[in-house]
């Protein structure tokens, strides 16, 4: 929208400023950790998983109105492969079940003539990204305000991602770690503006990947980051990711997002519902609103800034759970 109205320069300029904004407010924003007891955390993480599942279903059907039998077969075989690996294997093989499912599913699709290799053929062998490739940034006030609002929404969503990872890895999430996470996102957004690309935020889909793989240390992430940098310099290899058929990807996503939902439910199982009926209200309202409003057109008549807030199910669930918990449980301590 910014690019259409003010040009690409204004869009990238707004990205740069919003990245700086996230870095500057990260310290203040990180103080929200105490607002996330188990009832809030469980509700938010459950909502993350449930709002992502329709994305997986759409991909399984190749995102068309009338999915073909081939699409359904590829999605089902991918899910089956991942399940069999998780049931009958252990250790390293089990941890890469998603990768194996994607590779085997893509190979089967290729044997059926459903894989388009043209992106690999069209990609250059080597490409070095250059700053301001599409022109110098322009700093237009309304675009900057809009992008800072979007960045704030992303920070709320990322908080839910950090909470989910904290529960999976059993690592405590304090204000310092939250601040560092926000700063990393701000730096990524800033670099995105400098290199004329997209803003980068915490990817909630990866929570399921962490849960399913069982990898809970940061070292593999460093290796993966280096590998992605290499792929960015060698576009032909990077283009290989583009040839994965949507149904195959959807099958893998279905398993991952299901894991995210269950992770949230496990947290809710630790909440005291028996002696505190208010917790029922908090979980019920926040999850129902988050799942129901995600991507809906209910607020299309409102200004764009409000639409961005209220059409993001994770943000809605987070805000509702925090506010309801603060009101209903303000004089109760979490056990």
Predicted regions and their residues:
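Membrane-embedded helical hairpins/re-entrant loop segments and their flanking transmembrane helices
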Residues: 146-218
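Early transmembrane hairpin of solute transport permeases
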Residues: 1-75, 243, 247
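Helix-loop-helix hairpins and the membrane-proximal interhelical loops
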Residues: 94-179, 303-306
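Hydrophobic core segments of alpha-helical transmembrane domains in multi-pass membrane transport
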Residues: 17-26, 43-57, 74-88, 99-114, ...
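C-terminal ends of transmembrane helices
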Residues: 21-34, 82-90, 159-168, 204-212, ...
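Transmembrane helix-loop boundary segments of multi-pass membrane transporters
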Residues: 4-7, 30-38, 67, 206-224, ...
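Loop-to-transmembrane alpha-helix initiation sites
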Residues: 39, 68-76, 94-99, 243-254, ...
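Membrane-interface helix termini and inter-helical loops of multi-pass transporters
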Residues: 58-67, 116-134, 237-243, 297-308
């Amino acid at each position: 929208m910014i690019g259409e109205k003010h040009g690409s320069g204004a869009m990238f300029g707004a990205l740069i400023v919003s990245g700086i904004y996230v870095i500057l407010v990260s310290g203040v924003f990180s103080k929200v950790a105490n607002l996330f007891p188990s009832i809030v955390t469980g509700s938010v993480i459950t909502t993350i998983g449930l709002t992502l599942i329709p994305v997986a279903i759409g991909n399984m059907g190749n995102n068309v109105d009338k999915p073909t039998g081939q699409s359904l077969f590829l999605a089902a075989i991918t899910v089956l492969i991942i399940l069999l690996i998780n049931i009958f294997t252990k250790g390293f093989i089990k941890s890469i079940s998603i990768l194996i499912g994607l590779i085997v599913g893509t190979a089967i699709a290729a044997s059926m003539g459903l894989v388009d290799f043209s992106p690999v053929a069209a990609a250059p062998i080597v490409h070095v990204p250059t700053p301001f490739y599409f022109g110098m940034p322009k700093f237009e006030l309304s675009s900057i305000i809009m992008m800072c609002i979007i960045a704030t929404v992303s920070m709320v969503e990322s908080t839910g991602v950090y909470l989910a990872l904290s529960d999976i890895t059993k690592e405590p999430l304090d204000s310092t770690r939250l601040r560092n996470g926000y700063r990393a996102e701000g730096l990524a957004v800033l670099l995105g503006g400098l290199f004329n690309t997209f803003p980068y935020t915490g990817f909630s889909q990866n929570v399921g990947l962490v849960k399913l793989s069982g990898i809970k240390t940061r070292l593999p992430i460093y290796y993966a980051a280096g590998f992605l940098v290499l792929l960015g310099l060698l576009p032909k290899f990077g283009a290989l990711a583009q040839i994965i058929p949507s149904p195959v990807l959807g099958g893998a996503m279905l398993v991952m997002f299901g894991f995210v939902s269950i992770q949230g439910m496990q947290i809710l199982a630790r909440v005291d519902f028996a002696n505190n009926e208010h917790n029922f209200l908090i979980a019920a309202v926040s999850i129902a609103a988050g799942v129901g409003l995600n991507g809906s057109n209910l607020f299309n008549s409102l200004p764009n800034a409000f639409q961005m807030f209220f059409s993001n199910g994770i943000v809605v669930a987070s805000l509702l759970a925090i506010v309801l918990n603060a009101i209903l449980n303000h004089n109760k301590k979490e056990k």
